């Protein structure tokens, strides 16, 4: 087996998204849903449909707070919202790209046609084996590919190929090994599936060794919708784990851009890869400079960072070949393409693979959220993480975490900065007593509790008191430093409440 090849965020393009200027903004016209998804972080409200006028007022406020390319219409299940076509039409009329995040259960050919006419730009379909979907309960990820193909074909055929199609899958420990198969499936349908998204499961853990508070008052995180008793021992999956799985079938797999965390600048919360090829072959991967060029170019000419594109733009990768003079990654693709003249007329596609790593809770209680998250939603006049709204609804503020027994008292693992787990190899090697490879359950971000910058003193290290040193009478003015007694650096162990980013849709 090939040794793990570490991801190198220092070589990737840091996506320029931020709170005020982003590619996407989240919108929930309803919190009513027609499915139960184990990874969902929104409570199903049978009376959750909002008046269209209220939703439009929310969008008017969003315009004042945030520049955005696309509006992700989610929920709940947006396809059962009675005004979904009118809402899509309104969003498109404002110059935004309407994108629907759906479980696909209510999708019909007629609805695809109506939404296409209203100006819909893209669908993101959430399908995975932990959903309680009638007729599909108990099916494996492989068996669910039949449903994925049915939805992709419906979107392609009834939109005339003008609406982009993406698929989300929440990844759990028991489905991690399905990633190579899902990656192959997505490539086999590059002509109809423009994006594949892997969302790494998170849930709040009530028994993770933390005391949780909201506004200074103790709270029971077991009351949150994203707490699942049977997931208390679930080990968090990291972006590196997903990359390792993809590299089992494609050793050349290499991301090009990422979004970091609020606490760990090297954590890869949104990790983007751009693959060039067709259903039978991969010609290569586009590099960081290309990702940067696309974002900067789009922002310069259209004033926003790029979200979704129309499918025809990613069906003609040959149009990029003139840039081979300036781009090493495009040059590699071009040279590989030249070696097969019999396929020069075949259509080349660009397919995005996005890995989303939700909230990481460190041993000192800090919560590592997405810095500049695209899925921010308006809540009571401010933009907040959509995956944490349940905390705001129940407690009026985000939850904060403190290790039981004092700082790091019951922690099981150190933060990446202390362990060297998320540092470049050369830097990690300089740290004392480095812990073995990247902690598997120590990072990730999802809708976990607290992310309010209530600076809980990051892992305060307890310093063993050192006996004062007697100084020579001749030099009273220059006290020597205390005897070099080693710090008893509180080694941490991890306990981490978390939540799921796995919205039953996106």
Model-derived features: positions:
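Flexible mid-to-C-terminal extensions adjoining Fe-S/redox cofactors in radical SAM and related proteins
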Residues: 297-439, 505-506
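Canonical Radical SAM [4Fe-4S] cluster-binding loop centered on the CxxxCxxC motif
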Residues: 17-53, 65
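N-terminal [4Fe-4S]-dependent radical SAM core
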Residues: 1-26
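Radical SAM enzyme [4Fe-4S]-AdoMet core and its adjacent flexible, acidic
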Residues: 133-149, 153-343
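Radical SAM/AdoMet-radical enzyme domain recognition
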Residues: 56-73, 81-200
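Non-heme iron-sulfur electron-transfer modules
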Residues: 2-4, 47-58
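Long, low-complexity, intrinsically disordered segments
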Residues: 440-443, 448, 452-506
């Amino acid at each position: 087996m090939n040794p793990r090849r570490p991801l190198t965020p220092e070589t990737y393009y840091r996506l320029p998204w931020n709170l005020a200027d982003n590619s996407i903004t989240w919108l929930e016209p309803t919190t009513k849903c027609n499915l139960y998804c184990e990874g969902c972080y929104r409570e199903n409200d049978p009376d959750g449909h909002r008046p269209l006028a209220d939703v439009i007022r929310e969008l008017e406020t969003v315009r004042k707070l945030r520049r955005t390319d696309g509006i992700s219409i989610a929920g709940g299940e947006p396809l059962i919202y009675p005004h979904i076509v009118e809402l899509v039409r309104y969003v498109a009329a404002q110059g935004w790209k309407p994108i629907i995040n759906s479980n696909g259960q209510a999708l019909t050919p007629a609805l695809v046609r109506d939404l296409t006419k209203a100006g819909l730009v893209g669908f993101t379909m959430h399908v995975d084996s932990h959903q309680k979907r009638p007729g599909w309960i108990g099916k494996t990820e492989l068996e669910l590919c039949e449903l994925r193909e049915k939805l992709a074909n419906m979107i392609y055929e009834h939109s005339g190929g003008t609406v982009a199609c993406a698929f989300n899958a929440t990844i759990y420990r028991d489905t991690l090994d399905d990633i190579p198969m899902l990656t192959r499936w997505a490539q086999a349908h590059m002509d109809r599936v423009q994006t594949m998204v892997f969302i790494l499961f998170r849930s709040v853990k009530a028994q993770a060794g933390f005391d949780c508070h909201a506004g200074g008052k103790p709270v029971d995180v077991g009351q949150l919708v994203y707490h699942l008793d049977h997931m208390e021992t679930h080990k968090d999956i990291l972006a590196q784990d997903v990359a390792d799985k993809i590299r089992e079938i494609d050793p050349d797999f290499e991301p090009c851009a990422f979004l970091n965390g609020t606490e760990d600048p090297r954590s890869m919360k949104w990790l983007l890869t751009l693959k060039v090829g067709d259903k039978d072959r991969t010609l290569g991967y586009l590099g960081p400079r290309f990702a940067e060029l696309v974002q900067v170019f789009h922002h310069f000419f259209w004033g926003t960072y790029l979200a979704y594109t129309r499918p025809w733009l990613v069906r003609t990768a040959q149009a990029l070949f003139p840039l081979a003079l300036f781009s090493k990654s495009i040059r590699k693709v071009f040279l590989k393409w030249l070696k097969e003249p019999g396929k020069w007329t075949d259509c080349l596609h660009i397919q995005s693979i996005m890995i989303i790593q939700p909230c990481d809770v460190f041993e000192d209680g800090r919560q590592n959220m997405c810095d500049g998250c695209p899925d921010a939603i308006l809540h009571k006049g401010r933009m907040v993480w959509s995956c944490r709204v349940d905390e705001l609804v129940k407690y009026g503020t985000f939850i904060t975490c403190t290790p039981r027994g004092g700082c790091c008292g019951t922690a099981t693992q150190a933060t990446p900065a202390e362990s060297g787990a998320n540092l470049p190899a050369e830097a990690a090697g300089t740290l004392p007593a480095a812990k073995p490879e990247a902690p598997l359950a120590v990072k990730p971000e999802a809708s976990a509790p607290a992310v309010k910058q209530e600076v809980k003193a990051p892992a305060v290290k307890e310093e063993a008191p050192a006996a004062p040193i007697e100084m020579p009478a001749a030099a009273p003015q220059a006290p020597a430093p205390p005897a070099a007694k080693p710090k008893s650096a509180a080694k941490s162990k991890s306990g981490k409440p978390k939540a799921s980013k796995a919205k039953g849709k996106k």
